[in-house]
């Protein structure tokens, strides 16, 4: 509730009653990906793979690495955001990046780049629970063509990673385009400082520690707790361990992770969007064909645009509001220098 007794627009609560139980295929293996933390926390809960901030303690932070700021300097007069509509997902990606000034604006020759799609679920592309594989493959091709010295592609899947990476079509498409695919086994994580309002440390996939550039490639979909899952929410997939504890304050934890990563570029996949029963989906009746890709470096602006595709007011999406407050971007995407093509 707000101070004047009105309901908080984005207060976390239980998922809607008509929300189906999550697909738990492979969750035993997922639970096995707890890295670095073995002690029980908070009322006997299991190890999480990250540490919540202890507001009552004044302990020194351990000497852990911090993920560097991956943002690229914006050239004078450059376009902030590109929105492209058309039937060919790969062409939409190319046109969006061209409108921003080309991949060379974001990736320099020899740099190490990690690409982060959503590969959380054991779903087919048509079910719109994961990023479209054609979108992902084109991003990889553009990064390779820009001269990147190393291109990783990774995500910490919720369902069994082997199934998610294969059934989504992303692993095959990314490898064919030139990426090194990193599955989230226990050896793939490194503990880092998060230094957020809620999160203190976390076990993250190692490419995010080693990369020079980070490219976020999320899908637009409804989410039962956070209302939507898009750019900012996609950073849950860098963490090892069980992430359910973060749902108790989902909007702040989303912003903590986004502030930790600070990506170079975000390419928002709205080829197909999931309108209901997210984030897992499953029914084609919940999927809408949008044939849209948006790209830019302001994740808050991109998520505000994505929210409108889901029929949401960006001001009602907590992580968009909190992201703006944290200085991660603006929800006023129409005020940015934006190019719209097609449609």
What residue spans do the PLM features occupy?
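N-terminal and secondary-structure boundary signal
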Residues: 2-343
């Amino acid at each position: 509730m707000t101070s004047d007794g009105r309901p908080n627009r984005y207060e976390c609560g239980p998922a809607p009653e008509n929300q189906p139980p999550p697909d738990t295929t492979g969750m035993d293996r997922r639970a096995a990906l707890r890295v670095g933390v073995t002690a029980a926390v908070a009322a006997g809960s299991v190890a999480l793979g990250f540490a919540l901030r202890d507001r009552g303690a004044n302990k020194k932070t351990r000497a852990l690495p911090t993920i560097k700021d991956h943002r690229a300097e914006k050239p004078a007069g450059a376009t902030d955001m590109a929105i492209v509509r058309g039937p060919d997902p790969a062409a939409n990606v190319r046109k969006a990046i061209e409108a921003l000034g080309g991949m060379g604006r974001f990736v320099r020759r020899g740099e190490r780049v990690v690409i982060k799609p959503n590969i959380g679920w054991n779903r087919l592309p048509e079910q719109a629970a994961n990023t479209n594989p054609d979108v992902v493959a084109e991003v990889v091709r553009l990064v390779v063509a820009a001269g990147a010295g190393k291109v990783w592609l990774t995500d910490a899947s919720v369902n069994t990673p082997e199934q998610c990476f294969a059934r989504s079509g992303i692993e095959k498409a990314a490898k064919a385009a030139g990426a090194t695919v990193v599955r989230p086994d226990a050896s793939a994580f490194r503990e880092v400082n998060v230094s957020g309002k809620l999160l203190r440390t976390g076990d993250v996939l190692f490419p995010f520690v080693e990369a020079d550039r980070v490219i976020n490639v999320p899908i637009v979909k409804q989410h039962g707790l956070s209302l939507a899952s898009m750019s900012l929410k996609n950073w849950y997939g860098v963490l090892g361990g069980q992430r359910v504890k973060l749902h108790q304050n989902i909007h702040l934890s989303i912003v903590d992770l986004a502030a930790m990563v600070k990506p170079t570029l975000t390419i928002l996949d709205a080829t197909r969007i999931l309108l209901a029963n997210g984030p897992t989906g499953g029914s084609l009746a919940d999927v809408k064909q949008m044939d849209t890709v948006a790209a830019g470096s302001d994740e808050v602006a991109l998520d505000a645009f994505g929210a409108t595709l889901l029929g949401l007011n960006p001001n009602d999406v907590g992580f968009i509001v909190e992201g703006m407050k944290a200085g991660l971007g603006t929800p006023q995407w129409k005020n940015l220098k934006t190019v719209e093509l097609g449609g």
